[in-house]
Amino acid sequence: MSTLSPSVVISDDEPGYDLDLFCIPNHYAEDLEKVFIPHGLIMDRTERLARDVMKEMGGHHIVALCVLKGGYKFFADLLDYIKALNRNSDRSIPMTVDFIRLKSYCNDQSTGDIKVIGGDDLSTLTGKNVLIVEDIIDTGKTMQTLLSLVKQYSPKMVKVASLLVKRTSRSVGYRPDFVGFEIPDKFVVGYALDYNEHFRDLNHVCVISESGKAKYKA
């Protein structure tokens, strides 16, 4: 029987790191409070998640389904590690990729109104091991909606990998199968996570400042 994998738990009082200790684009210098998860730590954790995914799902054709846009960096890096394991294993499995785009945020709040605004023909998921890759689980409503949609196509197995899971009172209780980091209820950006389409070009996961929220508010 499969079990949910453990995660790196970041405490509520985690101070983070001073911005001056890292390379931060100058145009964001006044918009961030701190670096929360450095890029190197993200990569090391992602490498281990790839091993966990292959152990759990590596016996059958995997379709990796990326949730755009925020999931694309984590998706690309996770797949690089999975492909390395696959090509260096005595027993490799075929792997394909697909993409879907959802929208549930306005400014820093999850609206609860889930819109599917992209995606290919999901009938290709039938009979496959499906790995859904997401950047962050906040309330969990978005992922529950997507899981209901995916399961209509009768995949052999569905697992979810999320780089981040937020501890929040708004959560519906959903937890993905593979989690990189469990974080406090802060609005984070970077490593492709955005605030109204800004900050995707940061390498690190950072906490946005109040002035940053005001500057880029929709």
From Swiss-Prot:
Q: How is the cofactor bound?
A: Binds 2 magnesium ions per subunit. The magnesium ions are essentially bound to the substrate and have few direct interactions with the protein.
Q: Which residues carry this modification: N6-acetyllysine?
A: 103
Top-level taxon of the source organism: Eukaryota
Which cofactors are required for activity?
Mg(2+)
Q: Where is this cross-link: Glycyl lysine isopeptide (Lys-Gly) (interchain with G-Cter in SUMO1)?
A: 115
Q: List the catalytic residues.
A: 138
Q: Which Pfam families match?
A: Pribosyltran
Query: Which E.C. number(s) belong to this protein?
Result: 2.4.2.8
The UniProt entry, under CDD domains, shows:
PRTases_typeI (cd06223)
GO molecular function, a single term: identical protein binding
Binding of Mg(2+), residues: 194
A GO CC term assigned to this protein in UniProt = cytoplasm
Q: Which PROSITE patterns match?
A: PUR_PYR_PR_TRANSFER
Its recorded reaction(s) are: IMP + diphosphate = hypoxanthine + 5-phospho-alpha-D-ribose 1-diphosphate; GMP + diphosphate = guanine + 5-phospho-alpha-D-ribose 1-diphosphate
| Family statement | Belongs to the purine/pyrimidine phosphoribosyltransferase family.
Kindly state the subunit structure of this protein. Answer: Homotetramer.
Q: State the name under which the record lists this protein.
A: Hypoxanthine-guanine phosphoribosyltransferase
The source organism is Rattus norvegicus
From which lineage does this chain's organism come? Eukaryota, Metazoa, Chordata, Craniata, Vertebrata
* Gene field: Hprt1
